[in-house]
């Protein structure tokens, strides 16, 4: 398997297009044409993680947090530059799966919920997928070759199906005037043509390409075509809603997940004895969604990186919070390893995948 093949597999199951627009995901450092010798999953790509990959003989690291996030202005032998230089010197490929793994139905938030032992887990804050239904009108004799060209260029595909068109027949009319150069008809004379309306679906990113192809292969000088926007609730969303088997107090629940996640500290906002049943989770830094979570029926909102004033606001408004620290996302190391191994086993791909043993939490606890 080459890096390009691994990227295709990852994109199929955890699409990079579902990442936030500000994010930096995908192949950050590497060569798509090299063979994968092994994969190391990590929360952060630190120098220690790079050394671990080198020791194992693995040439691919998949990290959750992007090492390169903003524009790089220099690569010196210190700080982040040292990490990047070492990756390049040892021909190690670095792939980032950040917010695309956050919003995935099997991603970070699902991994956290399962690690906490929760039940009835479902995605919340679902994304909206944008599609377009394209329709254009073409003379009956040109239908076949026109559809062939669209299909050859990747349009009119639905999952594992290609050449997905709908046709309806009708009668078109037009009158060429002035300096027109009509394929059919004569200047200043109304022409009637048996036409077919062709309809097909495209993804949002294909819109400009579809317009280009229609203009290129349609027999008319000025073809008529429409893009009708369709929005559909996506399977992807930022966060999950889940439940404990039996009601428990806020303090007991906080202590329970501290133990199950094996993290050194947990903070919570709310009355210690308040009963908890439904839990909303956004791993990492999810403040800003806490009130929406309550509106969706959550008894407590679990996230990390909660600041003082956000916690105070929540307390004043009666919103229960639990801060499990940003590093709690470390569960993705084993979770992503499992996802990859399942796919590799299904497709009979013999490549080692290991979760990094390096703790990249920058904090020390006393």
From Swiss-Prot:
Q: What GO cellular component entries does it have?
A: cytoplasm
Q: Which residues participate in Zn(2+) 2 binding? A: 65, 326, 329
Q: Which InterPro entries match?
A: DUF34/NIF3, DUF34/NIF3_bac, DUF34/NIF3_sf, N-reg_PII/ATP_PRibTrfase_C
**Signal peptide range in chain numbering:** none
One GO molecular function term of this record is: metal ion binding
Q: Which residues bind Zn(2+) 1?
A: 64, 102, 329
An example of a Pfam family matching this protein is DUF34_NIF3
The answer to whether UniProt assigns keyword ATP-binding to this entry is no
Query: What are the entry keywords?
Result: Metal-binding, Zinc
Answer yes or no on keyword Zinc. yes
According to the record's subunit comment, the protein's assembly and interactions are:
Homohexamer.
Identify this protein by name: GTP cyclohydrolase 1 type 2 homolog
Q: To which species is this protein native?
A: Staphylococcus aureus (strain MSSA476)
């Amino acid at each position: 398997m080459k890096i390009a093949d691994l990227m295709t597999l990852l994109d199929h199951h955890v699409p990079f297009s579902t990442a936030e627009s500000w994010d930096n995901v995908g192949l950050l450092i590497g060569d798509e044409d090299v063979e994968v010798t092994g994969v190391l999953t990590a929360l952060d790509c630190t120098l220690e993680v790079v050394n671990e990959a080198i020791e194992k003989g693995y040439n691919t690291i998949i990290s959750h947090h992007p090492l390169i996030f903003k524009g790089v202005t220099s690569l010196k032998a210190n700080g982040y530059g040292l990490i990047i230089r070492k990756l390049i010197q040892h021909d190690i490929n670095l792939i980032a799966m950040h917010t695309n793994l956050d919003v995935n139905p099997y991603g970070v938030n699902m991994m956290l919920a399962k690690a906490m032992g929760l039940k009835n887990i479902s995605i919340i804050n679902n994304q909206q997928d944008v599609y377009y239904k394209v329709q254009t009108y073409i003379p009956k004799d040109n239908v076949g070759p026109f559809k062939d060209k669209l299909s050859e260029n990747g349009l009119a595909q639905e999952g594992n199906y290609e050449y997905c068109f709908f046709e309806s027949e009708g009668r078109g009319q037009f009158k060429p005037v002035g300096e027109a150069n009509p394929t059919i008809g004569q200047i200043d004379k109304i022409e009637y043509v048996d036409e077919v309306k062709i309809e097909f679906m495209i993804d949002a990113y294909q819109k400009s390409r579809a317009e280009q192809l229609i203009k290129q292969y349609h027999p008319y000088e000025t073809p008529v075509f429409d893009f009708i926007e369709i929005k559909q609730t996506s399977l992807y969303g930022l966060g999950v809603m889940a439940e404990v088997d039996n009601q428990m107090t806020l303090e007991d629940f906080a202590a329970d997940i501290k133990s199950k996640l094996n993290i050194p500290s947990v903070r919570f906002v709310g009355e210690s004895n308040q009963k908890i049943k439904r839990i909303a989770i956004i791993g990492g830094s999810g403040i800003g969604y806490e009130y929406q979570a309550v509106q969706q029926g959550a008894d407590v909102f679990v996230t990390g990186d909660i600041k003082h004033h956000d916690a105070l606001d929540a307390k004043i408004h009666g919103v229960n919070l639990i801060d499990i620290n940003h590093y709690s996302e470390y569960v993705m190391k084993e979770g992503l390893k499992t996802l990859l191994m399942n796919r590799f086993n299904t497709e009979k791909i013999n490549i080692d995948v290991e979760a990094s043993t390096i703790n990249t939490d920058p904090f020390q606890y006393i």
